[in-house]
Amino acid sequence: MSDVMFIQKRMHRSPAFRELTASSILVLLEFLSRRQMVKIGRRDRWVTKNNGEIVLTYTEITAKFRIARSTFRNSIDQLVKLGFIDIAHHGGGMMKDCSKYGISERWRNYGKEAFIKKSRKKDNRNLPLAPSIR
């Protein structure tokens, strides 16, 4: 695992980045740190090898950054809405099925007609509530 994380200059100067909350920036940086970058050909062209396979769980983020679960959820919503990440697989936390994420470039077109809007799919399952402790 590398000690280096690549962030494009355009990203932090973009209108989409300026709308991020502090918690969303922390979560975005954690996603970017989990990318596996590989060089393609002789040119300086890099691609994300594990795009769509990046896992970041509620348990990890709350332990590492002491961010509340609701804050993490709101950060995911904001990162998807502004075009920084996409959800490749919606996991079901109770079944130990983790969500998988991909780094997106949609943020480049944020505020333009070409911007593709996405949002996190809401969980409408009627899951039973955990039994209360008496």
Language-model region placement:
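Residue-level marker of intrinsically disordered, low-complexity segments enriched
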Residues: S2-M5, K9, F65, I85, ...
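Compositionally biased, intrinsically disordered low-complexity regions enriched in proline and serine
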Residues: I7, R18, L29, Y58-T59, ...
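Winged helix-turn-helix DNA-binding recognition segment
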Residues: Q36-I103
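Short recognition helix of helix-turn-helix/winged-helix DNA-binding domains
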Residues: M1-Y58
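A broadly tuned preference for mixed-charge, low-complexity surface segments
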Residues: F31-S33, L79, P128-I133
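Short, amphipathic alpha-helical interaction segments positioned at domain boundaries
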Residues: E105-R134
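A broad, structure-centric signal for solvent-exposed, well-ordered loop/edge residues
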Residues: S14, R18, V27, A63, ...
